[in-house]
Curated annotation (Swiss-Prot):
Organism: Rickettsia conorii (strain ATCC VR-613 / Malish 7)
Name under which the protein is recorded: Probable chromosome-partitioning protein ParB
PANTHER family reported in the protein's UniProt record: CHROMOSOME-PARTITIONING PROTEIN PARB-RELATED (PTHR33375:SF1)
Pfam families listed in its UniProt record: HTH_ParB, ParB_dimer, ParBc
Coiled coil region boundaries: none
GO cellular component: a single term: chromosome
One Gene Ontology term of the molecular function aspect: DNA binding
Key words of the record: Chromosome partition, DNA-binding
Family per record: Belongs to the ParB family.
Top-level taxonomy: Bacteria, Pseudomonadati, Pseudomonadota, Alphaproteobacteria, Rickettsiales
Domain of life: Bacteria
Function, as annotated: Involved in chromosome partition. Localize to both poles of the predivisional cell following completion of DNA replication. Binds to the DNA origin of replication.
Biological processes annotated in GO: chromosome segregation; positive regulation of sporulation resulting in formation of a cellular spore
Length: 286
């Protein structure tokens, strides 16, 4: 029997058999309203222009490849085609029903979609995370199943640790994966991300910026003279009110007090010479 390459390697590897041609499968014509998308599929954004282009093709040529669904008519493979048929106002479409339980259906749908080359980096990263958390995969097993390197799996999994705002920027191709990786677990990731975007830094410049930030240094971007790093935040965020507050607190406690103010928080620092002076500070605080 001929192999159906159109379904990809995902179904065949997961079902433990070669995917056979659709001529030998049972193809049924189903009302499109009975079919529902898989809520756990990694792709969350579908470009309207591409769906419209596919819808126009379906109107002219019909749906050439059936959609794969489970017993509950939940889509395993073919959501783009289903959406295009909906847009084209097609009432009935050909489907192949796979006899799978809910767990098998969900797993195969995830794997099949992750293997697509047009997922965004974050969609792929979230898919990896979901498989590991819900299907007992390890990074090594996932790499083997998907035919990807362990380092690729590990690097994408770490992107899930980024603040949501940065994940969104990666998803929208405003930040690259290389730039985003530099910001993982950084206290001021969102501030730095905005600076990277506003100053059009490349990955190497981003790496240098983060390195210097941790060293409490500053540098200048190629296109302007603004200082960046911890000193940049402190120098630009400290205003007259904070200076007056520092002066008042220093006089009240009789010691040196400094305030480091950042866009995402700050530090109030009491400087003492010895434990006796520390005791006096604590006494006044109480």
């Amino acid at each position: 029997m001929a192999k159906n390459k159109g379904l990809g390697r995902g179904l065949s590897s997961l079902l433990g058999e070669e995917v056979i041609s659709i001529e030998s499968e049972i193809v049924q014509i189903i009302n499109i309203d009975k079919i529902r998308p898989n809520e756990n599929q990694p792709r969350k954004n579908f470009e309207y222009d591409k769906i419209k282009e596919l819808a126009d093709s379906i109107l002219n040529n019909g749906l050439l490849q059936p959609i794969i669904v489970d017993n509950n008519f939940q889509i395993i493979a073919g959501e783009r085609r289903w959406r295009a048929c909906k847009l084209a106002k097609v009432l009935e479409i050909p489907v192949i029903i796979k006899n799978l339980d809910a767990r098998e259906s969900m797993e195969i749908a995830l794997i099949e979609n992750i293997q697509r080359t047009d997922l965004t980096v974050m969609e792929e990263a979230r898919g990896f995370k979901y498989l590991i958390e819900n299907f007992n995969y390890t990074a090594e097993k996932l790499a083997e199943r998907l035919g990807k390197s362990r380092s690729h799996i590990a690097n994408l999994l770490r992107l899930n640790n980024l603040p949501q705002s940065i994940q969104d920027k990666v998803n929208e191709n405003i930040l690259s994966m290389g730039q985003a990786r530099c910001l993982i677990n950084h206290e001021h990731a969102e501030v730095i991300a905005d600076y990277i975007i506003n100053n059009d830094l490349n990955v190497r410049q981003t790496e240098e910026l983060v390195r210097q930030w941790y060293k409490n240094e500053y540098t200048k971007s190629p296109n302007n003279n603004n200082k960046i790093g911890k000193r940049f935040l402190k120098d630009n965020a400290t205003d007259n009110d904070l200076e007056l507050l520092v002066k008042a607190l220093s006089e009240k406690f009789g010691i040196k007090i400094t305030i480091e103010n950042y866009p995402l928080g700050g530090k109030l620092i009491f400087h003492y010479k010895d434990l006796e002076e520390l005791d006096l500070i604590l006494l006044k605080l109480n």
